[in-house]
Curated annotation (Swiss-Prot):
One of its GO terms (cellular component) is cytosol. This is DNA-binding protein PAE3044. One of its GO terms (molecular function) is DNA binding. Keywords: DNA-binding. Belongs to the PDCD5 family. It comes from Pyrobaculum aerophilum (strain ATCC 51768 / DSM 7523 / JCM 9630 / CIP 104966 / NBRC 100827 / IM2). Pfam families: dsDNA_bind.
């Protein structure tokens, strides 16, 4: 009978650990959603509707580029280095700068 209770305790411990993992994962996802919502609110404040639509299009095609661009836009607006609201033309110029920084260059030697 002691073997059965040992297995029960072991099984209960596995369940407890799995539950903790799931709770941690859910909390991380919730925090990520909060950060994304805060970022979206900030972007709505600093971009014109046209610029925001362009950013959304970029996000569909190149999510990593959109994320870098979003961070750059928020930083520029927070430090006052760009006039707010940012219009589509200004967004294009900032996009070119961010793209040139994030683009990977591949060189092949033959």
């Amino acid at each position: 009978m002691s073997e059965g209770s040992f297995e029960d305790r072991e099984l209960e411990e596995i369940r407890r650990k799995k539950l903790e993992e799931l709770q941690k994962k859910a909390e991380l996802e919730r925090q990520a959603q909060i950060v994304a919502a805060q970022r979206r609110i900030a972007l709505k404040k600093i971009l014109t509707p046209e610029a925001l639509a362009r950013l959304d299009n970029i996000r569909v095609v190149r999510p990593e580029l959109a994320e870098a661009l979003e961070q750059q836009l928020i930083n520029l607006a927070a430090t006052g280095r760009v006039r707010v609201p940012i219009d589509e033309e200004t967004l294009k110029k900032i996009l070119e700068a961010v793209y040139s920084q994030t683009r990977r260059e591949y060189r092949f030697r033959l």
